Amino acid sequence: MKHGIKALLITLSLACAGMSHSALAAASVAKPTAVETKAEAPAAQSKAAVPAKASDEEGTRVSINNASAEELARAMNGVGLKKAQAIVSYREEYGPFKTVEDLKQVPGMGNSLVERNLAVLTL
């Protein structure tokens, strides 16, 4: 009986060791592919960001007191249609902005988001 249990345990341990070795080998083969994909993604993003900055340098500025939500979303970096609509709603409820820094009072607009877009915003 003891020999049977020992044989069973040895067989199971060898089988588990073999399966874990195969799983580790497969995982190490898959990892470089994931790393290559991540490395290629920032390069594509940086290429896409260059044309957007070129249009900002042309002098396209948008008035936060007169622009529609669509215009704000198009001009501001990191602001989608929903946040742009929040800006317009805030403006309609509380009146025109007195400074560009007043955008920080709009829900969802943080300091970094306002600072990032100061170059394209005007009253």
From Swiss-Prot:
The keyword Ribosomal protein belongs to this UniProt entry's keyword annotation: no
Region (Disordered): 40-62
Keywords: Repeat, Signal
Gene3D superfamilies reported for this sequence: AF1531-like domain (1.10.150.280)
Signal peptide positions on this chain: 1-25
SMART domains with a match to the protein in the record: HhH1
GO terms, molecular function: DNA binding
Top-level lineage group: Bacteria
Any one GO CC term of the record: type II protein secretion system complex
Composition bias type Low complexity, residue spans: 40-53
InterPro entries assigned to the protein according to its UniProt record, in alphabetical order: Competence_ComEA_HhH, Endo/Exo/Phosphatase_dom_1, Hlx-hairpin-Hlx_DNA-bd_motif, RuvA_2-like
GO biological process: DNA repair; protein secretion by the type II secretion system
Start and end residues of each HhH domain: 60-90, 91-120
Protein name as it appears in the record: Uncharacterized protein YbaV
Organism in which the protein naturally occurs: Escherichia coli (strain K12)
